[in-house]
Regions:
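A contiguous loop/helix-start segment that scaffolds small-molecule binding in enzyme catalytic cores
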Residues: 2-63, 126, 136-141, 197, ...
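Class I S-adenosyl-L-methionine
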Residues: 48-55, 59-65, 85-175, 180, ...
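Flexible loop/N-cap segments at domain edges
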Residues: 66-67, 71-73
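Short, solvent-exposed amphipathic alpha-helical segments in soluble enzyme
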Residues: 78-86, 104-109, 157-161, 186-188, ...
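Short hydrophobic/aromatic-enriched beta-strand-loop microsegments
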Residues: 108-115, 166-170, 189-199, 244-253
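Class I SAM-dependent methyltransferase SAM-binding "motif I" and its flanking Rossmann-like core
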Residues: 148-220, 263-267
Length: 321
């Protein structure tokens, strides 16, 4: 009763009060109350009310930049799912599945802002301006991005645009595609006998941008994951081998990672491009290069992976050197 009266006094409209209690009941306050941590809950609810009154006085909404993970809706974080339920508007990318969108509130407006190489339905600048305009209307905007928003997701640019307009922003990390793809394909990204580091690289550079450091990417004893590299696969292989990578170095392309239709095309730098072309692989797909790729084949041969890893089955195509 005490907090109900205090909230009613601080937040004048029914909508504002509803939003406040939604955040409280679905967030850490409720968890702390159930855990008997009433002092922590009291502090958290004070912070939440202060945040709500600050937003109210500014007359603006807020934006959640949310990583949706690599595809499987069960890989959404709890916080991502909670903010999806709170959002009035969801701006989503090309790689966001219907199963993930179904986690949003039923009455939330959905706006597609997808982009792909060479074909932008909406430009990045238009997306950023739309987020700003919606927030200035007092709406809660969920910017839903595949994987993690700060790993080749241009989330940093969106954060800069919003903070420049003094719009409240919450960033929610997601499982980046490399982690999800490797786990579901049974490929450890690091291994003390084979890879002491892992590098995430983009498969295509911005026009006029700096070229990748191929000597560094070809260095042995590491795993390299290329995002958005399917169309550049022959070039990537040629550059790596020219920089000293072995032709028999294991490599794999993972298509539609973590989804039921996932496929893994495995081979070596010598024959991978040919295998991928024969399998007619389509985007989205990741390229993994390193000795750890061979461990997947070992696990399958021992059938241990069937017991512990959600591997793609009939669609798998494995070619070993």
């Amino acid at each position: 009763g005490r907090w109900r009266r205090r909230v009613g006094k601080a937040l004048g409209s029914v909508l504002e009060r509803r939003r406040f209690w939604e955040r409280v009941l679905a967030g850490p306050v409720a968890t702390q109350v159930f855990a008997g941590q009433e002092a922590h809950a009291e502090l958290e609810i004070r912070r939440e009310l202060k945040r709500a009154t600050t937003v109210r006085s500014a007359g603006v909404g807020e934006v959640y930049i949310v990583g949706a993970g690599p595809g499987d809706p069960d890989l959404l974080t709890l916080k991502a799912a909670r903010l999806l339920q709170q959002a009035d508007v969801v701006l989503y990318d090309r790689l966001i599945s219907e199963a993930v969108l179904d986690r949003a509130r039923r009455d939330a407006e959905r706006i597609y802002v997808g982009k792909e190489a060479g074909r932008h339905h909406v430009t990045q600048e238009q997306t950023q301006q739309l987020m700003i305009e919606l927030a200035l209307q007092g709406k809660r905007v969920c910017r839903l991005k595949g994987g993690d928003p700060f790993v080749f997701g241009r989330g940093g640019e969106e954060l800069q645009a919003l903070t420049a307009q003094h719009i409240p922003v919450t960033v929610v990390p997601g499982i980046t595609a490399a982690l999800g793809a490797a786990a579901y394909a049974g490929i450890p990204l690091t291994h003390r006998d084979h890879a002491h580091s892992v590098t995430f690289a983009t498969g295509h550079a911005r026009e006029g941008g700096a070229a990748p450091d191929w000597q560094e990417l070809a260095r042995p004893g590491q795993t390299v994951v290329f995002y958005m590299g399917l169309s550049q696969l022959p070039t990537i292989v040629a550059e790596l081998t020219a920089a000293g990578a072995r032709l028999d170095l294991p490599a794999a392309v993972i298509e539609h990672a973590t989804l039921p239709e996932q496929r893994v095309i495995a081979g070596t730098l010598r024959d991978l491009a040919e295998c991928v072309a024969a399998a007619q692989v389509r985007s989205p797909a990741l390229l993994v290069v390193g000795e750890v790729v061979a461990l997947r084949g070992e696990a399958r041969a021992k059938e241990a992976s069937r017991l512990t890893l959600p591997l793609a089955g009939e669609n798998d195509r494995v070619k070993r050197a």
